[in-house]
Amino acid sequence: MGFWENNKDSITSGLKSAGKYGYQGTKYVAKTGYKASKKHYNNSKARRERKSGKKNSSDEEYESEDEMEYERKPTDIRSLKDPKSFPPPPLKPGQKTYAGQQQQQMPNGQASYAFQGAYQGQPGAGSMEQSQYAQPQYNQYPQQQLQQGVVPQQPPIYGEQVPPYGSNSNATSYQSLPQQNQPQYAIPSQVSLNSASQQSTGFVSQNLQYGTQSSNPAPSPSFQNGLQCHQQPQYVSHGSTNLGQSQFPSGQQQQPTTQFGQQVLPSPAQPHPQPQQQQQGQPLPPPRGQVILPAPGEPLSNGFEQQQQQQQQQQQQQPLNQNNALLPQMNVEGVSGMAAVQPVYGQAMSSTTNMQDSNPSYGASPMQGQPPVGGQPPVPVRMQPQPPQPMQQGNIYPIEPSLDSTSSTPHFEVTPFDPDAPAPKPKIDIPTVDVSSLPPPPTHRDRGAVLHQEPAPSGKIQPNTTSSAASLPAKHSRTTTADNERNSGNKENDESTSKSSILGHYDVDVNIMPPPKPFRHGLDSVPSEHTRKNALERAVPILPPRNNVEPPPPPSRGNFERTELVLSTNAANVQEDPISNFLPPPKPFRHTETKQNQNSKASPVEIKDEVLPGHPSEEDRNVEPSLLPQSKPQSKSQSQFRRAHMETQPIQNFQPPPKPFRRSQSSNSSDSSYTIDGPEANHGRGRGRIAKHHDGDEYNPKSENSTENGRLGDAPNSFIRKRAPTPPAPSRSEKLHEGAITSEFDSSKDANKYEKSIPPVTSSIQAQQSTKKAPPPVVKPKPRNFSLKANEYPKELTREATGQDEVLNSITNELSHIKLRKTNVNLEKLGGAKKVKDSSPVPSDLDEKYVSASGSITPPRPPPSRSSPKKVPPVVPKKNDNLKKKPPVVPKKKPLLKSLEPRPIEMERAYSGDISAADDNLNPFERYKRNVVPQEDDRLHKLK
């Protein structure tokens, strides 16, 4: 049976069930998806229809919606707009003018807005001017209240209450008011109608900073108070208005529950003592933080005023609660709708306080004639609450706190707090902390105090050092305050014990230590006066005190002056021995080096006359006089003079100065000493000279014994003895040859060692003294170096190899190879065999010699020396070959470039034809020139 036959039933049933459920699932999914898509489409279509019905384009819809939302948001902000856009409040029935105008006629003659009437019902036009935009609104309310009697009115939101700053429907003084920019949110200036009896509002005394009126001198004090109260929300409370009282009771008293709506309306029947109030209430300039309220209809600061009122009320509720009984009775003419704002921002200035009055101070009582009463002193601080003063009940209308505040002005709160200047206080505190936290200055003060103690003895002992050093720290200590010095005096005791390493040394050890430092400068100053003319003289006087060796002056041509200077400096320094010990060590070495350089550069004649006398004196100072033989300076002076003379001549004769050692090896045995001096003078102004000088220094006594060899043999003999003391017996000629070879090698190899061991000054001086006869033989050895006798060197090298190290022989052989090849170049110039130009010379005597010396080919004559050179020479010739191969490439490029550079100018007939691809490779621009230049060439020739 097949698999299908056995399982076809189960398979078919499974497929059927799977297909069935799959179909159901797909159908369900399709239906749900269709429904969802259809629903979404319908919704979107409805939305589109709605949008299309409203507007044509979605962009406009979005823009309009955004604009609407944007407009909705700034509604609160627009309350801050200029109140000029709003009309002035209408006069209440029975009111000929605004309440403020009747009571007070400002000198401006402008009827104040109802805010004055609201506060005090004062008709003074100046009060209108004084009234800020919020005030006329408040005035309306107080006017109504005045007409209505005691009518608790919640003034509309400040924006609503406050008429536009510029708007003056009535004979309003808004225009004249400079405080229009200063909105008075709550300026319930309560002013009793009776000028003598009451000042309606203590608000006036507490200048509400928000609406403080810097405007006309005779604005209603209530308005002024309101303006001030804006900036001084704490002074919101309406002070009881006692016309007889010149004080403006604290605004808190008048309106303990003064809110934005709170307004104490002065009774209209009450006579308005605004002129008195004007006198009493001096116009207060708006505080810095005063915020200009927008049009009274705008609820700009209501929320903020409410907050301020709540704060002030909380501060003032107790006095206000005390006055609450009076508040229904209180007849506050100056209390206007602004009064509600005043409790928040500040005490409403009583209408009696006239802005015309000169009271610019925030806390200044608005009443001119009357001093502030009831604890209403002029309030410099905006938020300072004043103690509430009971309002006269007869004059007080019941006041309804108006909590309505449509405008939120949190920034107003910030502004009054900012003028309080809390920030500068921490700034002031920070410098104080910094001044107190200055521990380091006491340490310096201690130094200064110690130095103050030092100058007296220092003037005796070390006037140069301690006086200068003490004076500077003394200045520093003087700069520090006396208190700091006193504190430092106490700290010095503690710190000197705790920090003896610092303060103790400054007190005690510093007296010893500092003098050397300044005294070094002092030494410089003292001898500098004598020796500024010559830098060498400065170093010389310093050297003898260092070693305390004053006798060295005997080598003397120019030492007499130096010794005198040294003696003078020593006499000056006798008092300060340790200082003299400290100073000289660095300076003498430095100056000696400079002297060596100067002497080496100087001409040989100058070296003989000037340098020789001075240097042996220095050498004697540095070295004991017993160790220095008298013959040394002579041999050195002669050798150095000879070398200096050698330097001039061989440099001119020989183009390759860097490789003089090779030539010296190739030189004859008799002239080897001369060649040594010559190449050393040429090549190793550093190495060759120094090594030979040192050799002469150490072995000059032997050179004295060897008078036959004279100055020539001194250096090589002494040098060979240094390197290999075993073969002292070889003949003088052999010694000279060996010295010529080994001295060069040793000078190049061990020059540094001798330089370190022995100062170069002595070598230069002795060489100069001993090198008088050297210059004439120097010229001779050079052709002898080129002579065929160069083969003799390997023989002598083998002799030396037996007695000396083979390494020296190998090195000398290498040097000979190098020099021989380059001597070939010199021979070419001299007229020698031109065949030598090639690294492999044509077979000849010279060629054989070169081969033997190099060891590359069978060296018949010097077999013993071959062993050492075989190892080394292959490396050297390779280097030489490379060097020889490289320089010809460079000159080839240079002439090509040189030829090419002038040719583009001349270019152009022969050049374009002569130069081919090689030129193109060198200068790609020339190809371009070839194509272009011929035309230009024609032009140029035409011009020519």
UniProtKB/Swiss-Prot annotation:
Keywords: Membrane, Phosphoprotein. Interacts with RVS167. The lineage of its organism: Eukaryota, Fungi, Dikarya, Ascomycota, Saccharomycotina. Residues 166-244, 349-362, 461-470, 760-771 have a biased composition (Polar residues). The keyword Transferase does not apply. The keyword Membrane applies. The modification Phosphoserine is found at S57, S58, S64, S471. Belongs to the AIM3 family. Residues 374-390, 859-876 have a biased composition (Pro residues). Residues 1-331, 349-805, 821-901, 916-944 are annotated as: Disordered. Residues 93-105, 130-158, 245-267, 306-318, 625-640, 664-673 have a biased composition (Low complexity). It comes from Saccharomyces cerevisiae (strain YJM789) (Baker's yeast). Residues 36-54, 885-896 have a biased composition (Basic residues). It comes from the Eukaryota. The modification Phosphothreonine is found at T726, T858. It is found in: Membrane raft. One of its GO terms (cellular component) is membrane raft. Residues 70-84, 483-497, 521-536, 606-623, 746-756 have a biased composition (Basic and acidic residues). Pfam families: AIM3. Residues 59-69 have a biased composition (Acidic residues). This is Altered inheritance of mitochondria protein 3.
